């Protein structure tokens, strides 16, 4: 019985890793720049209601794979701080409405009147922040030295 359960867990882990490899490869091939939010996964795991779902997603593995494949395919990769108020700001007008309870999924901006899905609005804000800031210089971004 233990071996059967261990085998099932190994199969799930293999399927998850295969999915993460395929997704990260597709993203790195299609997009010139990928921007991710640097989430505090260990802090999120302290919420017992979300812990199992978060732990099973393999976010840190996904981030590492995306970073590696962006280097491989010469794409841009940026992380923005977890302290950016991505779900607290209207992606259209920039109005900041403040912290929202996690149960609130839809928001109407009182400044411009646009209805937002919380996750879509946060994704747009992450994109805007990532595209507006210059990328840190990395070895792959530097020109090759010229020989005399």
Task: Report residues per predicted region.
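Positively charged, low-complexity nucleic-acid-binding target-recognition regions
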Residues: 53, 57-148
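Substrate-contacting helices/loops that form the catalytic groove of nucleic-acid
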Residues: 1-63, 133-148
């Amino acid at each position: 019985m233990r071996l059967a359960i261990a085998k099932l867990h190994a199969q799930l882990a293999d399927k998850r890793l295969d999915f993460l490899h395929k997704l990260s490869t597709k993203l790195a091939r299609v997009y010139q720049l990928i921007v991710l939010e640097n989430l505090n996964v260990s802090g999120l795991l302290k919420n017992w209601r979300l812990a199992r779902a978060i732990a099973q997603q393999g976010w840190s593995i996904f981030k590492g794979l995306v970073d590696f494949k962006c280097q491989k395919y010469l794409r841009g990769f940026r992380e923005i701080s977890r302290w950016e108020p991505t779900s607290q700001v209207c992606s259209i007008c920039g109005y900041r409405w403040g912290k929202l309870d996690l149960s609130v999924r839809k928001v109407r901006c009182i400044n411009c009147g646009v209805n937002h899905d919380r996750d879509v609005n946060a994704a747009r804000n992450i994109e805007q922040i990532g595209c507006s800031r210059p990328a840190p210089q990395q070895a792959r971004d530097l020109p090759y030295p010229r020989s005399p």
